[in-house]
C-alpha cells in the first residue's frame, strides 16, 4: 500500500541525525557486557528447577516450550523477567509472561513455570499477574494463561493471599476484563487445586489436557480432613501412614467432572500441543484491526544503523550525549517532526513513524542550558535531564494532544528528576508535574 492520508505531513517529515564520528570500542564493550549480564540472569532463572528433559519424559512441555508452540515465530517479547519483589530464592514469581503474536494477533501470555514446584503460587506472583492483566486492559488485547499451578506454597501462604492486590485480585481482574469485552483464555495442565483451581475457572474460555484437574482443594486436603478439628500426635501419625502406605486419594476435579458433567471446560486434548492448538483456534476467532488502517506511510528502516547506539550512549552517566542521534536510529527514515523546539529546551517532543505507524516521542535532552530556567534569573545554568517549568508545560500539552488523537507515545527517559527549592515551588513545578499524572 502506498496511498495514505495527509502525505505532506506524515510522509515528508524532516530528517535528523548524522553518521557517528567513529566507533568507541571501550564503550561498546561495557554496554554489551551489561546486556550479557542481564541475559545471563534471565537464562539462569528460566533454567532453575526441574530439568526440561525430566518434564518432557512425563509427556509435559515446559512453560517456555508451550509459549514457543503458541506464539508466532520470532514474535515473543518477555515482560518483567527479573521481577521478584519478595526475594524468592529461585529469583522469580513462578510465572513466565510477555507479549506474543498468535496468528498475527497480539496477546498477553502468562505461563505457570512448571519447572519450579509445579508452578505454585509464591509471594509476589499476584502482583506480577496483575501487571499482565493491566497490560491486557490498557492495550485491549486477549489475556491467555498456560496454567499449571499446584496451589499456594503452604509455608508462605500468609504472604500470598492477603491484601487488595493479593491472591484473590487476579481472579477479580479476570472478571473485570470479561465485563470490558477483553477475552481471557486458559489452557489447563496438571493439578490445579485451591488457588490453582480458581485460576482455572476464572477465565471465560477454558480448554484442558485430559489428565488435568481443577478443584477447590487437592488430595492433601481431602486426606487430611478429620472430625477432631485439630491435629494431635495420633492424627499426625495416621496422616503420615495414609500418605506413605495407604491408597492414594484420587485428585478431585478431573476432566471427567469438569468437561463431562459441569461443562466448565469446553474442550479436552490428549497432549500439551493439542491444548495450544485449541488456544490458537479461539484467538483466530477474535476480531482484529489490520495495521494498514493506521499506517501513515510505508514502513522503512532508519537512515542510520541501530548498532551506532553503542557509540552514542555513554556508560558514564556524567557525559552528555545527543538524544537526536538516538531518535535518528530508532524511527522510520530517521524522520522527526518536532513540537515547540525552542520552548522547554530540556525536553524534546514530536512525532515520528515506527513501522509506518504514527507515534509521539518524548525525550530528555542531555546538555547544559544557558540562562535557563528563566525563573532562576539571567545567569542560571540548567542541566539536561532535569525537569523545569517550560519543559513540564510542553510535555503536558504534547501528551494531552497525543491522548486526544489516540497516538501512542515512545518515552526515552533519562532524567535525574524535577528541579527543587523555593524558586521551583514559586514557579509552580509541583502542580505542573501533577498535570502529567492525570
Which residue stretches match the model-derived regions?
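Intrinsically disordered, low-complexity segments enriched in small/flexible residues
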Residues: 2-107, 111-118, 245-264, 269-386, ...
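Conserved catalytic cores of soluble enzyme domains
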Residues: 2-3, 9-12, 18-21, 147-291, ...
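Long, structured ligand/cofactor-binding scaffold of large enzymes
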Residues: 58-185, 389, 400
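Short coil/turn connectors at secondary-structure junctions
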Residues: 93, 103-107, 138-142, 179-184, ...
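Extended active-site and interfacial segments that coordinate phosphate-rich ligands
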Residues: 114-136, 204-206, 212-214, 219-241, ...
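Amphipathic coiled-coil/heptad-repeat helices and related helical stalk/stem segments
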Residues: 125-129, 169-170, 193, 252, ...
Amino acid at each position: 500500500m502506498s496511498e495514505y492520508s495527509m502525505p505532506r505531513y506524515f510522509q515528508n517529515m524532516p530528517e535528523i541525525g548524522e553518521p557517528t564520528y567513529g566507533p568507541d570500542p571501550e564503550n561498546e564493550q561495557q554496554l554489551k557486557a551489561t546486556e550479557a549480564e542481564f541475559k545471563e540472569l534471565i537464562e539462569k532463572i528460566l533454567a532453575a528447577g526441574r530439568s526440561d528433559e525430566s518434564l518432557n519424559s512425563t509427556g509435559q512441555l515446559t512453560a517456555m516450550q508451550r509459549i514457543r508452540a503458541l506464539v508466532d515465530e520470532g514474535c515473543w517479547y518477555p515482560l518483567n523477567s527479573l521481577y521478584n519483589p519478595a526475594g524468592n530464592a529461585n529469583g522469580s514469581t513462578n510465572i513466565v509472561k510477555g507479549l506474543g503474536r498468535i496468528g498475527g494477533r497480539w496477546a498477553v501470555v502468562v505461563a505457570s513455570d512448571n519447572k519450579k514446584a509445579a508452578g505454585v503460587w509464591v509471594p509476589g506472583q499476584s502482583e506480577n499477574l496483575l501487571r499482565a492483566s493491566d497490560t491486557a486492559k490498557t492495550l485491549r488485547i486477549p489475556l491467555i494463561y498456560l496454567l499449571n499451578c499446584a496451589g499456594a506454597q503452604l509455608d508462605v501462604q500468609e504472604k500470598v493471599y492477603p491484601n487488595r492486590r493479593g491472591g484473590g485480585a487476579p481472579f477479580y481482574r479476570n472478571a473485570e476484563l470479561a465485563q470490558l469485552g477483553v477475552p481471557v483464555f486458559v489452557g489447563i495442565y496438571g493439578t490445579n487445586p485451591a488457588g490453582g483451581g480458581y485460576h482455572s475457572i476464572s477465565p471465560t474460555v477454558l480448554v484442558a489436557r485430559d489428565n488435568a484437574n481443577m478443584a477447590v482443594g487437592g488430595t492433601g486436603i481431602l486426606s487430611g480432613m478429620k472430625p477432631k478439628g485439630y491435629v494431635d500426635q495420633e492424627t499426625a501419625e495416621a496422616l503420615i501412614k495414609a500418605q506413605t502406605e495407604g491408597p492414594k486419594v484420587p485428585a478431585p476435579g478431573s476432566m471427567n467432572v469438569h468437561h463431562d458433567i459441569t461443562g466448565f471446560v469446553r474442550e479436552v486434548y490428549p497432549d500439551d500441543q493439542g491444548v495450544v492448538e485449541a488456544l490458537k483456534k479461539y484467538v483466530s476467532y477474535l476480531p482484529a484491526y489490520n495495521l494498514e488502517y493506521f499506517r501513515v506511510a510505508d514502513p522503512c528502516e532508519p537512515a542510520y544503523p541501530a548498532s551506532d547506539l553503542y557509540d552514542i550512549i555513554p556508560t558514564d552517566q556524567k557525559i552528555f550525549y545527543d538524544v537526536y542521534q538516538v531518535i535518528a536510529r530508532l524511527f522510520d527514515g530517521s524522520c522527526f517532526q518536532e513540537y515547540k523546539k525552542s520552548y522547554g529546551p530540556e525536553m524534546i517532543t514530536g512525532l515520528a513513524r515506527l513501522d509506518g505507524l504514527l507515534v509521539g516521542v518524548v525525550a530528555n535532552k542531555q546538555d547544559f542550558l544557558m540562562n535557563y530556567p528563566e525563573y532562576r534569573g539571567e545567569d542560571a545554568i540548567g542541566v539536561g535531564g532535569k525537569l523545569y517549568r517550560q519543559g513540564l508545560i510542553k510535555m503536558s500539552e504534547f501528551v494531552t494532544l497525543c491522548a486526544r488523537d489516540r497516538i501512542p507515545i515512545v518515552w526515552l527517559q533519562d532524567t535525574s528528576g524535577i528541579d527543587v527549592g523555593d524558586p521551583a515551588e514559586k514557579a509552580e513545578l509541583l502542580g505542573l508535574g501533577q498535570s502529567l499524572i492525570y
